[in-house]
């Protein structure tokens, strides 16, 4: 890209999902990471995992509770009631997500300006088809609106294709387990990540607390439990962009 990032003081990368959003921030001057998880803790198991993450100095966990995402087909109150609740969620929770990002950013860097902030968000997978796809698009658009209003300028806003990030990390068919083990192994030789308290915590606790073996269609696979997978994915979005633009 023929664009100067000399004025950027903070990079923010976002991996968005409907129940767990992962965010990685990088302070350019201090060469330090800060991570954020915006997490629906309605399920007790998720709440327990969130509690274990408290006290990590470079990880902020913002907890909220709402009923799990449901499709129109599974709702008994019909389209009108479902749509009203859905739009209430879209407007409220995404505004709070961006407020949380801005609070952390302003704490990391005093007097941070919009023009000094670069935001990266994972692009849609246009081949995806699911009952929640439209919900994801509507939610993400609201996030983008708030980010461009209060966090960064349009010229510092980028959508990053997930396949390119996966290829950068290793292979295009990498799943969340592959991405997380690559993160823990520091496969791209990031000089700054070993300093991170979150990284060191995960090195010690990942296999015991955040990995679960499951069977799907008769095959065993390793599931990385939220919010870890989302935070790690946001880290790789950021690293891909920094390396692509020779900013690391």
Where are the predicted features?
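Phosphate- and other anionic-substrate recognition elements at nucleic-acid/protein interfaces
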Residues: 1-248
């Amino acid at each position: 890209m023929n664009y100067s990032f000399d004025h950027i003081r903070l990079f923010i990368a976002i991996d968005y999902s409907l129940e767990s959003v992962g965010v990685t921030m990088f302070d350019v001057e201090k060469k330090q990471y800060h991570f954020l998880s915006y997490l629906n803790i309605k399920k007790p198991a998720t709440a327990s995992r969130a509690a274990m993450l408290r006290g990590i100095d470079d990880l902020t966990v913002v907890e909220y509770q709402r009923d799990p995402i449901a499709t129109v087909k599974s709702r008994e109150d019909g389209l009108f009631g479902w749509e009203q609740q859905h739009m209430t969620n879209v407007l409220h929770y995404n505004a709070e997500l961006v407020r949380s990002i801005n609070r952390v950013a302003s704490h990391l860097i005093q007097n941070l300006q919009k023009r000094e902030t670069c935001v990266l968000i994972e692009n849609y997978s246009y081949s995806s088809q699911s009952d929640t796809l439209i919900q994801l698009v509507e939610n993400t658009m609201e996030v983008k609106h708030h980010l461009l209003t209060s966090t960064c300028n349009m010229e510092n806003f980028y959508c990053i294709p997930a396949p390119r990030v996966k290829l950068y990390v290793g292979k295009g068919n990498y799943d969340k387990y592959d991405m997380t083990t690559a993160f823990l192994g520091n496969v791209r030789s990031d000089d700054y990540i070993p300093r991170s308290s979150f990284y060191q915590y995960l090195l010690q606790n990942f296999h015991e607390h955040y990995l679960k073996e499951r069977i799907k269609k008769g095959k065993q696979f390793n599931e990385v439990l939220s919010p870890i997978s989302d935070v790690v994915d946001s880290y790789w979005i950021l690293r891909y962009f920094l390396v692509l633009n020779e900013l690391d």
